[in-house]
Amino acid sequence: MNDPNSCVDNATVCSGASCVVPESNFNNILSVVLSTVLTILLALVMFSMGCNVEIKKFLGHIKRPWGICVGFLCQFGIMPLTGFILSVAFDILPLQAVVVLIIGCCPGGTASNILAYWVDGDMDLSVSMTTCSTLLALGMMPLCLLIYTKMWVDSGSIVIPYDNIGTSLVSLVVPVSIGMFVNHKWPQKAKIILKIGSIAGAILIVLIAVVGGILYQSAWIIAPKLWIIGTIFPVAGYSLGFLLARIAGLPWYRCRTVAFETGMQNTQLCSTIVQLSFTPEELNVVFTFPLIYSIFQLAFAAIFLGFYVAYKKCHGKNKAEIPESKENGTEPESSFYKANGGFQPDEK
């Protein structure tokens, strides 16, 4: 019979009944392997998304950046303010409030480009918004955090990982640029790549959520208030982004694009900032909130996508669509949707 007071076999230091067991590095190894694989897959998916971006229209958004400006206001105006209001309203701990605000100040995530495709959004606007928000985050993140977190913490204690932001920018711009080139040179082949990549992108989004749940199982042990904020925050981002875009006079398909670009945050960047800025003891309180936000932003995105697909099947073909005026050097097109091919059968 085993002595209950004896040390376990793999203990490295024993003193009576006190033992030090080496920590398992399985999660660390799994995290590195999966991060590498997911990064490669994400680059391939973004390459396929680039195959739906037209150079002329993309440059049109850069030259006449009304849509990008609306997205900028949503990304670095609405989201940080919403995070601040939620933190004050729920009276959460200062550390928790800071993490909620970090989420709100992050640029848009690349998953928004995949979802914009599936809801027949404006891919040219989606890619240009993600690129610009990531680039502008170099200056806007420190500014927003300085404004909103000073009532809880010294803003100088929050570390902005500029190298990670730069890496995110490169991993977005390079594959998308190659995809744009393929679409320009070989449009028929680009359509095939796009079909495959869009399906792979949907699978990748689910895979990221599952992997996050495996690696950070402690995420389910978190303050109830953070669960509620993690539920409300992405919905508020999607809704307010859509509303502001509509008030600004953007057509419906661009409103959907802005909505996803607003609510879909770069939670990986947020996790990196949190890890660099807080002690291990503080991380126990706050580290899992980015994962909670990520889960709910994907869950509600899937729900909104389902509603859109159902609406499109019931009303899309019968809707009296108002042509959009010529803009950005493009021909007039429907203001309701601009079919990307997502959930749409090929014509016989």
From Swiss-Prot:
Q: How does it assemble?
A: Monomer and homodimer.
Keywords, A to Z, come to: Disease variant, Glycoprotein, Ion transport, Lipid transport, Membrane, Phosphoprotein, Sodium, Sodium transport, Symport, Transmembrane, Transmembrane helix, Transport
Bilayer-crossing residues are 29-49, 83-103, 127-147, 158-178, 196-216, 225-245, 285-305
Q: What is the protein name for this chain?
A: Ileal sodium/bile acid cotransporter
Q: Which residues carry this modification: Phosphoserine?
A: S335
Assigned protein family: Belongs to the bile acid:sodium symporter (BASS) (TC 2.A.28) family.
Q: Does the keyword Kinase apply?
A: no
From its record, what is one biological process in GO terms? Answer: bile acid and bile salt transport
Query: What are its GO cellular component terms?
Result: apical plasma membrane; microvillus; plasma membrane
Q: State what this protein does.
A: Plays a critical role in the sodium-dependent reabsorption of bile acids from the lumen of the small intestine. Transports various bile acids, unconjugated or conjugated, such as cholate and taurocholate. Also responsible for bile acid transport in the renal proximal tubules, a salvage mechanism that helps conserve bile acids. Works collaboratively with the Na(+)-taurocholate cotransporting polypeptide (NTCP), the organic solute transporter (OST), and the bile salt export pump (BSEP), to ensure efficacious biological recycling of bile acids during enterohepatic circulation.
Q: Which gene encodes it?
A: SLC10A2
User: Care to name a GO molecular-function term for this sequence?
Assistant: bile acid:sodium symporter activity
Q: Tell me which domain of life the UniProt entry assigns to the organism this sequence originates from.
A: Eukaryota
Q: Which species is the source of this protein?
A: Homo sapiens
Q: Where found?
A: Membrane
